[in-house]
Amino acid sequence: MLSMSKAVKARAHTWYTIDMEKGVFRFNKRLCPRCGSVMAYHKEPVPRWHCGKCGYTIFESQAPRQRPSRGR
């Protein structure tokens, strides 16, 4: 349980970008295509988006590694 001495930081305002000229706001995070929940971004060990509710994972594409030639 949280003690009263610890302050809880509000993070919800970082999830949106507001464009005042157009009068629109945009959600910065990804939504899960399977269940619709908000997905978390993980940098380590492999960059990916992961849904904690259903387990769906989207791996970010990386530059393909070149295989060494076999000398044939």
Swiss-Prot record:
A zinc finger (C4-type) spans 32-54. Coiled coil: none annotated. Its cofactor is Zn(2+). HAMAP family: Ribosomal_eS31. Zn(2+) binds at residues 32, 35, 51, 54. Belongs to the eukaryotic ribosomal protein eS31 family. The gene is rps27ae. Binds 1 zinc ion per subunit. One of its GO terms (cellular component) is ribosome. The keyword Transmembrane does not apply. One of its GO terms (molecular function) is structural constituent of ribosome. GO terms for biological process: translation. Keywords: Metal-binding, Ribonucleoprotein, Ribosomal protein, Zinc, Zinc-finger. SMART domains: Ribosomal_S27 (SM01402). This is Small ribosomal subunit protein eS31. It comes from the Archaea. Part of the 30S ribosomal subunit. Gene3D superfamilies: 6.20.50.180.
